[in-house]
Amino acid sequence: HCFLYFCRVMENNLSHLDLPETTMTHRNIILSKPFLKRIYIDWYVEFKNFSQQQSTTGKVVEIGSGGGFLKEIYPSVITSDIMPLSVCDMQFSAHEMPFENNSLKAIFMLNVLHHIPDNEQFLQEAQRTLQKGGFIYMIEPANTFFSRFIYKNFHHEPFDETVADWKFESKGPLSDANGTIPWMIFKRDLKKFNQLFPELELEVFRHHTPIKYLLSGGLSKPNLIPYFLFGLVTFIEKLLTPLNSKIALFQTIIVRKK
């Protein structure tokens, strides 16, 4: 019961999610919870290491930076959000990015793709702005047996894998979403993706993080276990790796421009 209680978030009025103040509150929560902050740090470090191993040069941009703190880990990153946030370098929509053709080395997004109302438009922009060999690095909700149970029953965001279209009606940048969009684009409709975006290629689709985020309490609940057990939980997750296609809550997706 503790697990289910912890997962349940407010179902009613979600308009507060679209306020910049809410995003800053989320940032303070992340920074104040060592277990949750460490999850973000590990994800940021993975991206930074991958990016720095690439031979390409150019701008590295985070889209939908929100309350994150990637710049503390990777100082040269240009942070951005659709909302006016004092902690971000730029404000713009993923549908219309203010960068020249073939100018970006990398685009990083953490739990952002499934909030973008028109992903075809975003991917067109990514295809335009990325240089040859540049890449999009995304960490997104996974669509697994376990994640469907969690996201459909205990999370406020829609999680509907039955819809045909990648687009959805949006009243606000955070209150509207569909958590299955990454799975739709890069698994169910991969052939369509390849046809629509001939210059882009799926390179990595990897499931991970089945239990760690739940135990952190996320943004809405307290930690379920103390921070000193983080290493043990990481070890347990490694043991569970063969089951990730069934139990992972997140996935890393890397798309490269040919």
Language model regions located:
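Conserved N-terminal segment of class I S-adenosyl-L-methionine
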Residues: M10-H95, Q251
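A short acidic, Gly/Pro-enriched loop at the edge of an enzyme's catalytic core
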Residues: H95-I107
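A short beta-strand submotif of the Rossmann-like class I SAM-dependent methyltransferase core
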Residues: A106-V112, M138
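A short glycine-rich, Lys/Arg-flanked "PGG" loop and its adjoining helix->strand segment in the class I
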Residues: E120-F135
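Conserved class I S-adenosyl-L-methionine
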Residues: I136-E169
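Acceptor-substrate binding/catalytic loop of class I
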Residues: G172-L190
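A C-terminal cap/extension of S-adenosyl-L-methionine-dependent methyltransferases
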Residues: K191, Q195-K258
